[in-house]
């Protein structure tokens, strides 16, 4: 018999992450900061590779969960500098090590998506224990998709929650031509949402870019049709 050996025995069949949003208070000496927070679990930063100014990410799978990542505004408010990797802030009187400082995007789209103020990234456990958490409300996974919508179906089956309370988005073909056409034809009703769901900033951004790309697709199709119309007119 033939036995195949994996080139990478430690490889995983899937990678996932979950997160919760909320509020948290950070303290450094006399400086206190109340900030929006995202409590992360799993490989969150693999899905969301934020722009690091200094330092590195931490993993929600780490044994120790006393880490945090802050943006440049938080770094200046707490320390007066953004060179603060390895320094300590207190969250609920518990010391947490700053592993990285990220640049918060400040473009028009980002602000409209919800990135209007300081955001701090901590472990889900930290947010639950020492902050105000809205509970896990985002789950993301990368997994094999041997046939169309296999992964989508597995996630939908495994969620086990009424679809009125969740929205499942399959991202691999999000900006494909068929999806762009679908977005064009849903113009006017697309912004209507009967579900009690608040999108995270990254989903708001993705939906915003869907609209932009759909508009550009309409423009492209019109340009493709123009020579045909011109030929017909000439005849």
Positions of PLM-derived features:
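A conserved catalytic-core signature of glycosyltransferases
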Residues: 35, 40, 64-65, 69-70
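Generic extreme N-terminal start-of-chain segments
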Residues: 1-2, 235
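Juxtamembrane interface at the cytosolic side of transmembrane helices
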Residues: 223-235
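Mid-to-C-terminal secondary-structure elements
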Residues: 43-52, 70-207
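N-terminal membrane-entry
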Residues: 206-226
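Lumenal/extracellular "mature" regions of secretory-pathway glycan-modifying transferases
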Residues: 55-60, 86
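Short glycine-enriched loop/turn motifs at secondary-structure junctions
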Residues: 29-31, 59-63, 134-135
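Short amphipathic beta-strand/extended segments in non-transmembrane regions
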Residues: 2-54, 170-171
């Amino acid at each position: 018999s033939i036995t195949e050996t994996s080139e990478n025995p430690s490889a995983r069949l899937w990678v996932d992450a979950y997160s919760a949003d909320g509020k948290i208070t950070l303290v450094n000496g006399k400086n206190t900061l109340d900030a929006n927070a995202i409590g992360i679990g799993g490989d969150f930063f693999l899905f969301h590779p934020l722009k690091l100014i200094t330092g590195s990410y931490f993993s929600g799978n780490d044994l120790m969960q006393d880490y945090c990542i802050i943006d440049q505004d938080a770094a200046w408010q707490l320390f007066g500098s953004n060179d603060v990797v390895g320094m300590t802030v207190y969250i609920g009187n518990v010391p947490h090590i700053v592993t990285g400082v990220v640049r918060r995007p400040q473009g028009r789209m980002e602000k409209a998506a919800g990135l209007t103020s300081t955001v701090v990234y901590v472990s889900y456990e930290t947010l639950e224990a020492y902050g105000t958490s809205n509970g896990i409300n985002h789950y993301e996974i990368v997994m094999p998709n041997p046939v169309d919508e296999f992964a989508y179906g597995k996630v939908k089956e495994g969620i086990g929650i009424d679809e009125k309370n969740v929205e499942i988005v399959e991202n691999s073909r999000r900006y494909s031509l068929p999806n762009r056409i679908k977005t064009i034809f849903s113009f006017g009703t697309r912004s209507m949402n009967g579900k009690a769901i608040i999108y995270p900033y990254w989903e708001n951004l993705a939906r915003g870019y869907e609209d932009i790309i759909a508009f550009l697709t309409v423009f492209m199709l019109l340009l493709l049709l123009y020579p045909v119309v011109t030929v017909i007119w000439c005849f």
